Amino acid sequence: MSIQHFQTKLGITKYSIVTNSNDSVTLRLMTEHDLAMLYEWLNRSHIVEWWGGEEARPTLADVQEQYLPSVLAQESVTPYIAMLNGEPIGYAQSYVALGSGDGWWEEETDPGVRGIDQLLANASQLGKGLGTKLVRALVELLFNDPEVTKIQTDPSPSNLRAIRCYEKAGFERQGTVTTPDGPAVYMVQTRQAFERTRSVA
């Protein structure tokens, strides 16, 4: 496995993970050419349920407006496409929690904290461990940056599948928080916990 990195226009180091294992979920940076595919994914029923709800179904123009700045490295959100055996199977993103705006993580003071979100594109692939593999790949990628101290996420309390997925990937529940999207289970994985688990393995 290798991890490639580069500097963006904002001076933020972004990473892309590459592996030769055929059964691994890998991540590549999303490009402008992926936006139409992401638009189609974001309108699939199993994704709509947890990604904004029916009233937030996006148009292609919505997706282009929201995600193109990230693709062009004009903001601190890094978008990825998850791959399995050369085929795209999902989307993931990481972002700097500090100063993320719009009411998110307003009390955060540590610039090393990263937030994550992800989805699997195909309902037929749910419950097969791919989500856990995706999250683990994303966690490893992010902790390759020595400045990252903690990774956090915020699934809905009703999204039991996501909560189990995060727990299998090494996240711990830290209680319930109120976010702009409503109540959420606050889950974290610290660098210390990640390195401890990796040393045992």
From Swiss-Prot:
<feature type="binding site">
    <location>
        <position position="159"/>
    </location>
    <ligand>
        <name>acetyl-CoA</name>
    </ligand>
</feature>
<comment type="function">
    <text>Catalyzes the transfer of an acetyl group from acetyl-CoA to the 6'-amino group of aminoglycoside molecules conferring resistance to antibiotics containing the purpurosamine ring including amikacin.</text>
</comment>
<feature type="binding site">
    <location>
        <position position="51"/>
    </location>
    <ligand>
        <name>substrate</name>
    </ligand>
</feature>
<dbReference type="GO" id="GO:0047663">
    <property type="term" value="F:aminoglycoside 6'-N-acetyltransferase activity"/>
</dbReference>
<keyword id="KW-0614">Plasmid</keyword>
<comment type="subunit">
    <text>Homodimer.</text>
</comment>
<dbReference type="Pfam" id="PF13523">
    <property type="entry name" value="Acetyltransf_8"/>
</dbReference>
<dbReference type="InterPro" id="IPR016181">
    <property type="entry name" value="Acyl_CoA_acyltransferase"/>
</dbReference>
<protein>
    <recommendedName>
        <fullName>Aminoglycoside N(6')-acetyltransferase type 1</fullName>
        <ecNumber>2.3.1.82</ecNumber>
    </recommendedName>
</protein>
<feature type="domain" description="N-acetyltransferase">
    <location>
        <begin position="25"/>
        <end position="192"/>
    </location>
</feature>
<dbReference type="GO" id="GO:0046677">
    <property type="term" value="P:response to antibiotic"/>
</dbReference>
<keyword id="KW-0814">Transposable element</keyword>
<keyword id="KW-0046">Antibiotic resistance</keyword>
<keyword id="KW-0012">Acyltransferase</keyword>
<keyword id="KW-0808">Transferase</keyword>
<dbReference type="InterPro" id="IPR000182">
    <property type="entry name" value="GNAT_dom"/>
</dbReference>
<dbReference type="InterPro" id="IPR030971">
    <property type="entry name" value="N6_acetyl_AAC6"/>
</dbReference>
<feature type="binding site">
    <location>
        <position position="154"/>
    </location>
    <ligand>
        <name>substrate</name>
    </ligand>
</feature>
